[in-house]
């Protein structure tokens, strides 16, 4: 996030349960999960508003890897055995896709409902796994634990690059947060918040009501 020039960034874990049914389409699944995370953090920040001040810009994201041969949504491996099985499945499929949903929120100045502005987007990248990777290399990679906390079980920015033959789309989307898309959402949300501030009471109709009352007198 430092690349986006944000002066102060606080990482706040979301307590939202990632329990949506895997039968959803991948883009539906990631979008619903990212939105759920953003709302959870926003609500938590509202509860501590007196102590910490009004919530700032909230950015939430969720990433899944999809085995395009079966349509299976792959998240983080649950164990070493599932990690090995996941990478072997990706090797057999050869092609898979990475979906990242981003949800950006900012509080509105006015009391207008729902009290915040939100913008969302989904980034999609096609990835080709190297079909010539051996079982031994997969096991050795799993033992490094580099991909244990990553959707799909590998990190393209690290040793996991030896497993990948190529990508079509955003590199940022595979290794983390798609920066260009995220920046665009931030600009839209902040513009909405600024518009709400400029509208103020005039656009709520208060002045017009007062003028009508004066005319009646």
Segments from the language model and where they lie:
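Anionic-ligand binding patches
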Residues: 25-217
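N-terminal G-site helix/loop of the GST-like fold
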Residues: 1-11, 189-192
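Short, acidic/turn-prone active-site loops that include or flank metal/cofactor-
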Residues: 13-22
């Amino acid at each position: 996030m430092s690349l986006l020039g944000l002066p102060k960034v606080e990482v706040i874990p979301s307590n939202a349960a990632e329990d949506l049914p895997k039968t959803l389409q991948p883009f539906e699944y990631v979008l619903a999960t990212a939105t759920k995370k953003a709302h959870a953090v926003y609500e938590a920040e509202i509860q501590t508003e007196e102590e910490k001040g009004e919530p700032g810009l909230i950015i939430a994201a969720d990433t899944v890897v999809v085995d395009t041969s079966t349509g299976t949504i792959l998240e983080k491996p649950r164990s070493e055995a599932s990690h090995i099985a996941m990478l072997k499945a990706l090797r057999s499929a050869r092609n898979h896709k990475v979906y990242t949903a981003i949800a950006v929120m900012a509080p509105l100045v006015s009391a207008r409902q729902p009290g915040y502005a939100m913008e969302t987007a989904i980034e999609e990248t096609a990835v080709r796994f190297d079909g010539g990777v051996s079982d031994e290399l997969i096991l050795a990679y799993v033992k490094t634990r580099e991909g244990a906390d990553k959707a799909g079980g590998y990190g393209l920015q690290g040793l996991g690059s030896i497993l990948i033959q190529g990508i079509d789309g955003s590199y940022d989307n595979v290794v983390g947060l798609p920066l260009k898309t995220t920046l665009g959402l931030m600009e839209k949300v902040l513009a909405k918040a600024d518009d709400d501030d400029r509208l103020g009471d005039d656009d709520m109709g208060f002045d017009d009501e007062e003028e009508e009352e004066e005319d009646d007198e």
